[in-house]
Amino acid sequence: MECSFSLDHYEHIIRSALEAGYVFMGFHEPTFGDSMQLFLRHDVDVSLDMAVRMAEVEAKLGVRSTYFVLPNSPIYNVLENESIDMILQIAAMGHWIGLHIDLPKTYVMKSLTIEQVTYSMFDFFRQFLPLAPVVSFHRPSEQVFGMKLLSLVNTYEDRFFRDIKYISDSRGQ
C-alpha cells in the first residue's frame, strides 16, 4: 500500500505490525526480554480532533499508544473544556496521555535546569490532565537526548532513541 498519510493507511500499518507479532508498549511500562516491542507515540502539535480519530483506529485494533499533548500549542489550549474532553476521550479508550514539553527560553534566564522546568510543568498539568509519568520534548535540543529523569520517563532516553530502531513521520517524511 502506498503511503498516503490517511487513517486507512495508518490502520494498515498497525495491522501489519500486529501480524508481524509486535507488542505495543507504554514508555513507562517495564520491558521484557527480546520480544518485538513497539513504543507508539503521537506528539499532538496541531489537532486533538485528529488525535481522537487515530485513537479510535488503535482502540478498534486493541492497540494502546501514548498521546503527548503540547501545553503551549498555538492551535489548541489543553486547559480549554473542549480540549480536556478530547484528551479524556483518548484516555478512556485505554491510551496514555503524556506531556509534550516545549522548553521556554526563560528557564536559562532564571538559572533553572531542564529537569526543574520539566517537573514544574508536569506537576502543574497533572492537576488537570490524566498524565502518565512520561514526557516528550518538542523540537528537542541536544541536552535532552539521553537525559534520564528521576520520576518521569523521557522518550529521548537512549533506550528508546539510540538502543532500538527509532522511526518518525515528522514533517510528513
Q: What feature does the model see in each segment?
A:
Residues 2-89:
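Active-site beta->alpha N-cap acidic-glycine motif
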Residues 23-28, 66, 98-100, 126-138:
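A structural signal for short, well-ordered beta-strand segments and their strand-loop junctions
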Residues 7, 19, 64, 97, ...:
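Generic intrinsically disordered, low-complexity segments enriched for polar/acidic and small residues
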Residues 20, 90-93, 127-129:
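A structural motif corresponding to the C-terminal end of an alpha-helix
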Residues 42-45, 101, 139:
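Active-site metal-binding loops of divalent metal-dependent hydrolases
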Residues 75, 103-173:
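Catalytic domains of cell-wall/extracellular-matrix polysaccharide-remodeling enzymes
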Residues 61-63, 90-105:
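Conserved SAM-binding loop
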